[in-house]
Amino acid sequence: MAHLFKEKSNCYFCFRCLESPVYLNCGYICCLKCLDSLEKSPEGDGVLCPTCSVVSLKEDIIHAKQLGALVTKIKNLEPQLNFILTMDQGMKIFQVTMTLDVDTAQNHLIISDDLLSVYYTPQKQARKKCAERFHPSPCVLGSSRFTSGRHYWEVVVGTSKEWDIGICKESINRKKAIHLSEKNGFWTVGVRAKKVYSASTDPLTVLRVNPRLRRVGIFLDMLEKSVSFWDLSDGSHIYTFLEIPDTDPFRPFFSPASSYPDGDQEQVLSICPVTNPGIFGIPVNPQ
């Protein structure tokens, strides 16, 4: 998938990596030096877009400084991206046995008997007081605690309209409203209204995701300081966070929909066990 990063950072005209990128009036992107090679307008006071023939005068041309900075970063990270994004075939050998940690579950979350599935209910659950428990945000952590190595797990999101999954620092403050962002110690992807997918960068990165997404693979590589997300319906890459810190242990993070009817089977999040990955139904006999 790394070729997609390279493709998006190429000049539309010379097809090489963008250098000092500029926008024409119509949105066409090319290198600053490629402007001299574009066809001139009949009047001679502008250039023609090679795609749509819209004329751009000198004052219409905008220097894309932010895009240029992004392209530079992509070029610098390309070796690491190539390494990470070609590991999908071998990720499953790092799959870990994991359950949900009930002692961290916010009291409006129902956890199944097998500790693999979770959904939200308006009815508050009677649980013991725990310093580890989330409040007020509807979140729960996985039982695993990661300090080194490579780890992989799969989460069934089904047709849920709202969810967030990924990893967080173990040291996050669980006793206040959660704001998902890297700077707050969260590396997650999620969806709102079943159509707006995003990664918890700051600001959020909107993602283009297959609408048939039902199961997500998560690969944490503490050697490469990255965590990547994969659409298991077609094996496509969703997003990778790079240069994650390694100063704190990480925990798997789950937050199901909290704004849909109680017991709605579509809103369940489930961890796939190592021996039998698959879709799980609604939790029964909740804890």
Curated annotation (Swiss-Prot):
Its main location: cytoplasm. Keywords: Cytoplasm, Metal-binding, Nucleus, Zinc, Zinc-finger. It is found in: Cytoplasm; Nucleus. Expressed in the ovaries and oocytes (at protein level). Expression restricted to gonads. In testis, present at later stages of spermatogeneis and abundant in elongating spermatids. A zinc finger (RING-type) spans 11-53. GO terms for cellular component: cytoplasm; female germ cell nucleus. SUPFAM superfamilies: Concanavalin A-like lectins/glucanases, RING/U-box. Residues 78-278 form the B30.2/SPRY domain. The keyword tRNA processing does not apply. GO terms for molecular function: zinc ion binding. The keyword Transcription does not apply. InterPro entries: B30.2/SPRY, B30.2/SPRY_sf, Butyrophylin_SPRY, ConA-like_dom_sf, PRY, RDM_domain_RFPL, SPRY/PRY_RFPL, SPRY_dom. Interacts with PSMB1, UBE2A and CCNB1. PANTHER family: E3 UBIQUITIN-PROTEIN LIGASE TRIM. This is Ret finger protein-like 4A. It comes from Mus musculus (Mouse).
